[in-house]
From Swiss-Prot:
Residue intervals on the Vacuolar side: 41-45, 128-146, 193-216, 284-302, 364-378, 435-538
Biotechnology comment: Transgenic plants of agricultural interest (e.g. cotton, Brassica napus) that overexpress NHX1 have enhanced capability to grow on high saline soils.
Topology in membrane: Multi-pass membrane protein
Gene: NHX1
Function as written in the Swiss-Prot or TrEMBL entry: Acts in low affinity electroneutral exchange of protons for cations such as Na(+) or K(+) across membranes. Can also exchange Li(+) and Cs(+) with a lower affinity. Involved in vacuolar ion compartmentalization necessary for cell volume regulation and cytoplasmic Na(+) detoxification. Required during leaves expansion, probably to stimulate epidermal cell expansion. Confers competence to grow in high salinity conditions.
Spans traversing the lipid bilayer: 20-40, 46-66, 107-127, 217-237, 263-283, 303-323, 343-363, 379-399, 414-434
Gene3D superfamilies registered for this protein in UniProt: 6.10.140.1330
Induction, per UniProt: Induced by NaCl, KCl and sorbitol in a ABA-dependent but SOS signaling-independent manner. Also induced by abscisic acid (ABA).
Interaction with CML18/CAM15: annotated span: 496-518
Entry keyword set: Antiport, Calmodulin-binding, Endoplasmic reticulum, Glycoprotein, Golgi apparatus, Ion transport, Membrane, Potassium, Potassium transport, Sodium, Sodium transport, Transmembrane, Transmembrane helix, Transport, Vacuole
Family affiliation: Belongs to the monovalent cation:proton antiporter 1 (CPA1) transporter (TC 2.A.36) family.
Name of the featured protein: Sodium/hydrogen exchanger 1
Length: 538
């Protein structure tokens, strides 16, 4: 059967039937990834990302052998497919599920790592390739190419580490790795686009400041656009109260507004990653509380499922695309050069990562008075390690820069594409497989005291895992009475922090307009909704 399927691949671009066959096989592979990923969940070396990648590699080898070297993949890679359809649900769900208190408590450190650190890493990689590539015969690259390579390989993929870390045992570390990963992706894409749009043939101090100003402009406006879209969705749902007639409308509106935020950012040439991430944070803080109970459950699982499928799709495809015969044919005459380029890039990634993680961690610790909030050396090693893996963002940016309509006719471009694939595969598989043992060694399981401070220790967390401990809705309807299990957290932190003043502003001005915690929709006749008027009469 597989022979007949693969035999149809050469005519994939011209035959609708062949496209359907390829899609069927790809969906079957996605199912296999999910099943095997579940079975290998407790494995010391494997995780779902590596499983999908290896299945993609195995499938690529099989197709390559059966098609006698004509093809290794089912679908043609498209950066539009990645940036428009696959990336938005992943980033939005990251913002929607984020532990907001931990994220904003460590916001300065996250921005140091995610924004400043990414620029440092990009600079070091760019300087390194400028020096090393000139000694290798790989083609003619200009300053813009070297800077673009720096931006491409500054984009991290911390999925493997996040799948291993326990955010209840190490909330600080998880928050830093998670937050930095999102900001890093956004920064890399913004820097890459800024480099692409600037004429770097006459680079001077004025142009450098202009480039920095453009970066800050994109960063700020993208964040504001995401927050504004989230607030609009909260206001509309709160005022019109769709759930009174249909929870389907609530769910549909939340999904469409989330996607609209990303597309608006692309329309205005902003950073869609930052926009949809902060839209997710705002919607989880306001909009999610304004919908009915059934809509809350549905949206939570829908966004998580879409994100999971998109991630699996990406790793599966990267595995298959790694064996694309057309890309490797261009560099087959000089395999040593391709290996040297890949090794140089991998070394620069490691050096560039270390160049900012340890110094910025030191600076961050200087500003922290509480010992529990400081980043110890073992945590710094984990943060450094989590950013060594490269994934789909690097692949997509490399395709954008070094291919034309999916083809790599220029030898230098082909070398960069194959080197990017090699770095992504090596870092994801090798570093990813070593992640569990490394974290087990550096971070032995914490005792119960750390989990007491986590957000999900009550049965209520089964239904509402998105919120932190001070964001749960009280069953009695009295939202001013503090919960008993939050007293410990209250006593162990300063009472006049930025978070304190934000809560004052939020409770006084934002929530009365946009809803949020405390706004409890009630659908007459629905026994599943919270706080019905009088359950005894039901």
């Amino acid at each position: 059967m597989l022979d007949s399927l693969v035999s149809k691949l050469p005519s994939l671009s011209t035959s609708d039937h062949a496209s359907v066959v390829a899609l069927n096989l790809f969906v079957a592979l996605l199912c296999a990834c999910i099943v095997l990923g579940h079975l290998l969940e407790e494995n010391r070396w494997m995780n779902e990302s590596i499983t999908a990648l290896l299945i993609g590699l195995g499938t690529g080898v099989t197709i390559l052998l059966i098609s006698k070297g004509k093809s290794s993949h089912l679908l043609v890679f498209s950066e539009d497919l990645f940036f428009i359809y696959l990336l938005p649900p992943i980033i939005f769900n990251a913002g929607f599920q984020v532990k907001k208190k931990q994220f904003f408590r460590n916001f300065v450190t996250i921005m140091l790592f995610g924004a400043v650190g990414t620029i440092i890493s990009c600079t070091i990689i760019s300087l390194g390739v400028t020096q090393f590539f000139k000694k290798l015969d790989i083609g003619t690259f200009d300053l813009g190419d070297y800077l673009a390579i720096g931006a491409i390989f500054a984009a991290t993929d911390s999925v493997c580490t996040l799948q291993v870390l326990n955010q209840d045992e190490t909330p600080l570390l998880y928050s830093l790795v998670f937050g930095e990963g999102v900001v890093n992706d956004a920064t890399s894409v913004v820097v890459f686009n800024a480099i692409q749009s600037f004429d770097l043939t006459h680079l001077n101090h004025e142009a450098a400041f202009h480039l920095l100003g453009n970066f800050l402009y994109l960063f700020l406006l993208s964040t504001l656009l995401g927050a504004a879209t989230g607030l609009i969705s909260a206001y509309v749902i709160k005022k019109l109260y769709f759930g009174r007639h249909s929870t389907d409308r609530e769910v549909a509106l939340m999904m469409l507004m989330a996607y609209l935020s990303y597309m608006l950012a692309e329309l205005f040439d902003l950073s869609g990653i930052l926009t949809v991430f902060f839209c997710g944070i705002v919607m989880s803080h306001y909009t999610w509380h304004n919908v009915t109970e059934s809509s809350r459950i549905t949206t939570k699982h829908t966004f998580a499922t879409l994100s999971f499928l998109a991630e699996t799709f990406i790793f599966l495809y990267v595995g298959m695309d790694a064996l694309d015969i057309d890309k490797w044919r261009s560099v087959s005459d000089t395999p040593g050069t391709s290996i040297a380029v890949s090794s140089i890039l991998m070394g620069l990634v490691m050096v560039g990562r270390a160049a900012f993680v340890f110094p910025l961690s030191f600076l961050s610790n200087l500003a922290k008075k509480n010992q529990s909030e400081k980043i110890n050396f073992n945590m710094q090693v984990v943060i450094w390690w989590s950013g060594l893996m490269r994934g789909a963002v690097s692949m997509a940016l490399a395709y954008n820069k070094f291919t034309r309509a999916g083809h790599t006719d220029v030898r230098g471009n082909a070398i960069m594409i194959t080197s990017t694939i090699t770095v992504c595969l090596f870092s994801t598989v090798v570093f990813g497989m070593l992640t569990k043992p490394l974290i087990s060694y550096l971070l032995p399981h914490q005792n119960a005291t750390t989990s007491m401070l986590s957000d999900d220790n009550t049965p209520k967390s089964i239904h509402i895992p998105l919120l932190d401990q001070d964001s749960f809705i009280e069953p009695s309807g009295n939202h001013n009475v503090p919960r008993p299990d939050s007293i410990r957290g209250f006593l162990t932190r300063p009472t006049r922090t930025v978070h304190y003043y934000w809560r004052q502003f939020d409770d006084s001005f934002m929530r009365p307009v946009f809803g949020g915690r405390g706004f409890v929709p009630f659908v007459p006749g629905s026994p599943t909704e919270r706080n019905p008027p009088d359950l005894s009469k039901a």
